[in-house]
Amino acid sequence: MAAASEERMAEEGGGGHGDGGSCSAAGSAQRQPPAPPSQAPPPGSQAPAAPALAPDHLPQNNTLVALPIVAIENILSFMSYDEISQLRLVCKRMDLVCQRMLNQGFLKVERFHNLCQKQVKAQLPRRESERRNHSLARHADILAAVETRLSLLNMTFMKYVDSNLCCFIPGKVIDEIYRVLRYVNSTRAPQRAHEVLQELRDISSMAMEYFDEKIVPILKRKLPGSDVSGRLMGSPPVPGPSAALTTMQLFSKQNPSRQEVTKLQQQVRTNGAGVTVLRREISELRTKVQEQQKQLQDQDQKLLEQTQIIGEQNARLAELERKLREVMESAVGTSSGSGQSEESPRKRRKATEAIDSLRKSKRLRNRK
């Protein structure tokens, strides 16, 4: 009944942008039976002072529709979204309130699903092999399937909702999504995903098919810029697939859909996270480069100190070698002048061996 009434309201100009009082009066006038013919008063009786007001002309100060929108929304919040979608038939003012609540309900159920999915993902392990054996694996599967269903509903309805041509019509789908999400939150061992989501898939598929077949053709004629292509070419628009395609492309360029904006926002967030990671890596690399430069400076200082020590050792060795030679020459001179000592050859051998050992040690140190 709600779907047929939505089609009828779309044909009449239905986006719900009209005066509430006039519609309620017109609708009640159509539902009221014709008044009986007036009878003349009997002779001798007095005529009434003023005619009685019909029910349609009674003051509406005490009716539900006359309340502020906030009060009406607070009252309707105790009802299901399916009942709210059926209340759109009451009058145009009630239609406006119900449309607003249905649109807000779809956005709220999306946020609630994102919150549930974030909580489940935080408890799951990061490895895919461990996730399959985890106790929350079925919870994650059900939430992933609900996310797919929400994406399909978003692509089907929200383009026209953002253009203020209609509202999110199937309130029963919102109720079913809430039922599934509450079931996932309250159950430790839920059933398989296809068993839990069978009803949601059925009613959402029927709602999307009916919307595409019956309501979208009516709404396409009301899209802003539907006749712009014909006026730009100097001729009236020709109905057909090409004209509809041109209209949709023009509208999509002028007013980007909500899905495209969401994708751009996600891409910006991803790029921002990547830039943050790169900045962190660059700062770490700079710290490492500074540490390496400090180590190189320390090594250069140590090398300079070692070079100075080696130079000092070489100078000392040269001085000792010179002194040793002088001693040996004096010893050889004294031994050759006397020629009587038997130990002079032994002293010469020892002196030559000492000189050779000093020379070898000096060569080895120079090589080092």
UniProtKB/Swiss-Prot annotation:
This is F-box only protein 28. Pfam families: F-box. The modification Phosphoserine is found at S235, S242, S344. Probably recognizes and binds to some phosphorylated proteins and promotes their ubiquitination and degradation. Residues 12-21 have a biased composition (Gly residues). GO terms for cellular component: kinetochore. PROSITE patterns: FBOX. It is found in: Chromosome, Centromere, Kinetochore. Residues 1-56, 328-368 are annotated as: Disordered. Keywords: Centromere, Chromosome, Kinetochore, Phosphoprotein, Ubl conjugation pathway.
